[in-house]
Swiss-Prot record:
This is Ribosome biogenesis protein NSA2. Residues 1-43, 61-87 are annotated as: Disordered. Keywords: Nucleus, Ribosome biogenesis, rRNA processing. Involved in the biogenesis of the 60S ribosomal subunit. May play a part in the quality control of pre-60S particles. Under normal, rapid growth conditions, high levels of NSA2 would allow the progression of pre-60S particles through the ITS2 processing. A motif (Nuclear localization signal 2) lies at residues 51-58. It comes from Saccharomyces cerevisiae (strain ATCC 204508 / S288c). The keyword Hydrolase does not apply. It is found in: Nucleus, Nucleolus. Residues 1-40 have a biased composition (Basic and acidic residues). Component of the pre-66S ribosomal particle. Interacts with NOP7 and RRP1. Interacts with RSA4 (via WD repeats). Belongs to the eukaryotic ribosomal protein eS8 family. Ribosome biogenesis protein NSA2 subfamily.
Length: 261
């Protein structure tokens, strides 16, 4: 019997639209405008119900904000004395470090260390327009249909990649522009090794380009570093490590990257 999970099953079998994340972001951005429009246009009983609902949402939000602000330790904390004895005058302005404050500062410090650990060589890159990224392919008997696109940049596809049927393939990734290996430079050792690419983790241009595996300047890729003999603190061999593309692959014809260590 069906268990009302047909939507999840369809997503598992066929995946999501290529522009799903972009559509979701735009839908969320439009939500505030829709709420404002409804608040202005609804009248009568519907308007009262809508206003009541919005009021309840705002009250709960204020409570959350207040609770969050109270969780932040501000002002003077407990005095230094723990035995109940009175403090001398010159010690009254001193404060004892609160546990919550210490935990908060340690979390902030860890975040800073993590950000420093994963700092990339190229923090900013030039934006690429869709006209530069995609080439319109005319199809049909009279070449009147223009719903197909061909990627003009270098891409990476996995080992088990299979093209969709030609009549259903909307975005074409040419075989001549597919890359499987990259020239990866180790910044500390100063050596460059030709390593196989495992995956494209993040393209700074768009989430859709990440899903398509487009390789542009600033893209974070995962490479197989087992040949370098790198090991963890526990003695295990490191298999994959992140690297950032530092060149324009479509101009140079190859992928150059710097290992993130």
């Amino acid at each position: 019997m069906p268990q009302n999970d047909y939507i999840e099953r369809h997503i598992k079998q066929h995946g999501k639209r290529l522009d799903h994340e972009e559509r979701k972001r735009k839908r969320e951005a439009r939500e505030s405008h829709k709420i404002s429009e409804r608040a202005q246009k609804l009248t009568g009983w519907k308007g009262k119900q809508f206003a009541k609902k919005r009021y309840a949402e705002k009250v709960s939000m204020r409570k959350k904000i207040k609770a969050h602000e109270q969780s932040k330790v501000k002002g003077s904390s407990k005095p230094l004395d723990t035995d109940g004895d009175a403090l001398p005058t010159y010690l009254l302005d001193r404060e004892q470090n609160n546990t919550a404050k210490a935990i908060s500062s340690s979390i902030k410090q860890k975040r800073l260390e993590k950000a420093d650990k994963f700092s990339v060589p190229l923090p900013k890159v030039r934006g690429i327009s869709e006209e530069e990224m995609f080439k319109v392919i005319k199809t049909g008997k009279s070449r009147s249909k223009s719903w197909k696109r061909m990627i003009t940049k270098h891409t990476f596809v996995g080992e088990g990649f299979t093209r969709r049927p030609v009549k259903m393939e909307r975005i074409i990734r040419p075989s001549a522009l597919r890359q499987k290996k990259a020239n990866v430079t180790h910044p500390e050792l100063g050596v460059t090794v030709f390593l196989p690419i495992l995956a494209v983790k993040k393209n700074p241009q768009s989430p859709m380009y990440t899903q398509l595996g487009v390789l542009t300047k600033g893209t974070i890729i995962e490479v197989n570093v087992s040949e370098l003999g790198m090991v963890t603190a526990g003695g295990k061999v490191v298999w994959g490590k992140y690297a950032q593309v530092t060149n324009e692959p479509d101009r140079d014809g190859c992928v150059n990257a710097v290992l993130l260590v």
